[in-house]
Amino acid sequence: MMRMFRYTNTLQRTAKISHVLWARNYAKDVRFGPEVRAMMLQGVDVLADAVAVTMGPKGRNVIIEQSWGSPKITKDGVTVAKSIALKDKFQNIGAKLVQDVANNTNEEAGDGTTTATVLARAIAKEGFEKISRGASPVEIRRGVMLAIETVKDNLRRLSRPVNTPEEICQVATISANGDKSVGNLISEAIKKVGRDGVITVKDGKTLCDELEVIEGMKFDRGYISPYFINTSKGAKVEFQDALLLFCEKKIKSAPSIVPALELANAQRKPLVIIAEDLEAEALSTLVVNRLKVGLQVCAVKAPGFGDNRKENLMDMAVATGGIVFGDEANMVRLEDIKMSDFGRVGEVVVSKDDTMLLKGKGQKAEVEKRVEGLREAIKESTSSYEKEKMQERLARLSSGVALLRVGGSSDVEVSEKKDRVIDALNATRAAVEEGIVPGGGTALLRCIQKLNDLKGANEDQNMGIEIIRRALRMPCLTIAKNAGVDGAMVVAKVEILDGDYGYDALKGEYGNMIERGIIDPTKVVRTAISDAAGVASLLTTAEAVVTELPLEEAAAAGAAAGLGALGGMGMGGMGM
């Protein structure tokens, strides 16, 4: 005969109360193993699918809703990746990790974000599958990184330098989605300002793209205080026909800059102060004059450090016809400033991160003398760091600034085209830096043969190598699929071909990719595979994921538990 037992009232109440305490203390959602990996992979898939449709010459556009203004239409992989946020937190973590791959590739190489995203998805997917069958995640990652080093070495061997304007034009055209006019524009800009010159992309005001070369200097220091901003077209300071005050030392007191402010105000000209730094007293004087009096003034920290900062200030002074205060060779005190001591420029644009001085009024003979001195110093220098810094200064002094104004019939069209122009410009710079390889995913397919001969220390490492071998086929396969053909057949055919031969997706033909102008910058391909493998292989080693518990869910759980406890206490009081 079965006996039935009943909890005592005290035990019932204790059980209910402990449940209430547990629910109230529970603030994080923790999940483990295959379940959470599958959810992250779903997020990776959503992001990769959205980005992959833009790949190749026949890739499609993506329309992104914006919180303000018209929707954005783009074919830029990193813009699409950045726009994606998923409701499910575990899926969103997977998406965000691949988003980081796209961002890192974009920052380092300026292009190749779609390739990096497609590769990251392939590596993560294969990695999860192998781990679910019992392979060691750590050993798989080691195998993946071993394969990546072999791929990077092979890409360097395949690479060839970019020398002619025609090759530069080809690289830019491919990155601009086959837009020859953009390729020509960038090639022309590089020809005008040189490979080390500064090229800036802006919104145009006409239907056509325009190239304007302005003699000027740009450096990576912005305004010290946002109170200097004087335009509603973004967080910028814009002045026309401005005076420049250069100071090598820190400006400590307000009285030391008052004479300069009075001179500028008397001439009704804007004043830009470029100094090592400004202490609080001097800075507050400028800000108060800007806000209360309406004085057109802005303060910027001088670029560089130590001797390099001093030389940068001297370059600017020569280019604009001013002097540098605080310099040992110049004994004039800041308080004794005269109008002839100011530098002069036709236009100044200062953002949060950089400053552009355009149309400097310095004497050409003095500028040429300074340029020649720099060239001699570069030849004599034995330090690669010093050479690099002097090369940057030479570019600013001699080359000027090229402005690419992107035209179009609407803001949406200009925005879409501007994304492509920036991509093309970044890709071109990367190509000039490290050379080019055959495009269309061909270079990565040529690395597969090298991996066939590579062996890891154990079977799990060999699985990691196999994951990369399979992933290398994905860019070519995705380009072919977007062109409406069988991707697997195209990949199989290209693998049989030799050297530079690959698939021209635009024409639907096989041929020599270099001769057809279908090329990728080596740096872009190398960065894409390296970043994708690094993040995706780390993703596969994850065993647990912790997220915040949604507030409404936590509150509901607490309320339900509270009601249950009250009910339990009531029944206990009734003697049940």
Curated annotation (Swiss-Prot):
PROSITE patterns: CHAPERONINS_CPN60. One of its GO terms (biological process) is open tracheal system development. One of its GO terms (molecular function) is ATP hydrolysis activity. One of its GO terms (cellular component) is mitochondrial inner membrane. Residues 1-61 form a transit peptide. InterPro entries: Chaperonin_Cpn60_CS, Cpn60/GroEL, Cpn60/GroEL/TCP-1, GroEL-like_apical_dom_sf, GROEL-like_equatorial_sf, TCP-1-like_intermed_sf. The keyword tRNA processing does not apply. Disruption phenotype: Flies are male and female sterile; reduction in numbers of primary and secondary spermatocytes. The keyword Heme does not apply. It is found in: Mitochondrion matrix. Keywords: ATP-binding, Chaperone, Developmental protein, Differentiation, Mitochondrion, Nucleotide-binding, Oogenesis, Spermatogenesis, Transit peptide. First detectable expression is seen in the posterior part of the dorsal tracheal trunk at stage 14-15, which marks the beginning of terminal tracheation. In the larval gut, expression in proventriculus is stronger than in midgut and hindgut. Malpighian tubules shows low expression and late third instar larval imaginal disks and brain showed moderate expression. In larval ovary and testis, expression is strong in the posterior region. Pfam families: Cpn60_TCP1. CDD domains: GroEL (cd03344). Disulfide bonds: none annotated. PANTHER family: 60 KDA HEAT SHOCK PROTEIN, MITOCHONDRIAL. Prevents misfolding and promotes the refolding and proper assembly of unfolded polypeptides generated under stress conditions. Essential for proper development of trachea, spermatogonia and spermatocytes. Belongs to the chaperonin (HSP60) family. This is 60 kDa heat shock protein homolog 2, mitochondrial. It comes from Drosophila melanogaster (Fruit fly). The gene is Hsp60C.
